[in-house]
UniProtKB/Swiss-Prot annotation:
Record InterPro entries: Peptidase_S1_PA, Peptidase_S1_PA_chymotrypsin, Peptidase_S1A, Trypsin_dom, TRYPSIN_HIS, TRYPSIN_SER
Stated name of the protein: Glandular kallikrein-10
Changes after translation: Probably N- and O-glycosylated.
Signal sequence extent: 1-18
GO BP annotations, alphabetical order: regulation of systemic arterial blood pressure; zymogen activation
EC number, UniProt record: 3.4.21.35
Amino acid sequence: MWFLILFLALSLGGIDAAPPGQSRIVGGYKCEKNSQPWQVAIINEYLCGGVLIDPSWVITAAHCYSNYYHVLLGRNNLFEDEPFAQYRFVNQSFPHPDYKPFLMRNHTRQRGDDYSNDLMLLHLSEPADITDGVKVIDLPTEEPKVGSTCLASGWGSTKPLNWELPDDLQCVNIHLLSNEKCIEAYEQKVTDLMLCAGEMDGRKDTCKGDSGGPLICDGVLQGITSWGNVPCAEPYNPGVYTKLIKFTSWIKEVMKENP
């Protein structure tokens, strides 16, 4: 039944590619099958990505907040019957308390906006079964290094200006840049709670529908796709990601207090 709902929603426009005012793979490639087993798809009135960090917990972007969530795990293709596919509801969501609530609603980006703390935990209705196609990924323990090679993934739009969603999970290789590159690019605030990643000549970027997905640098989960330029993949406009190393204590506290 969930497959039919997903197909109809995406095909007939019942789900938007991303929450209003936010981004979030352009210039990427089809991920190798089961190479990103921690990647999840979150279906509500929007399409977002997420990351399995514990059998019972998914981390995503706070701007993906909704009144309901359907979580798809173990997926490579959203529209094919796959052996590792699992489906879960969400018992409770925990947006970061310092993320501004009005940014969760219909909001057009304004000069000076601060999207810090764009992080949310989802408690699954029942634990995911850990298999070859569904695995957890550890939280970071060290600061990421500027210049690191990073990989972002998602089912978001592959065209900067149009809503063109792929069937298959897409990956893109980008580099971690200094935050100064994003400060120069945007009128919105870029803080030390964020990471700046992309290519300065454009061509490669996360885009609409990739929000909440992973940014993995040198093999370590370091970021969650948050926001960026519209259209995506423009020169001198890298993507902006939530910096997870700044939030590990909060994440662990929420998980401990809500077993």
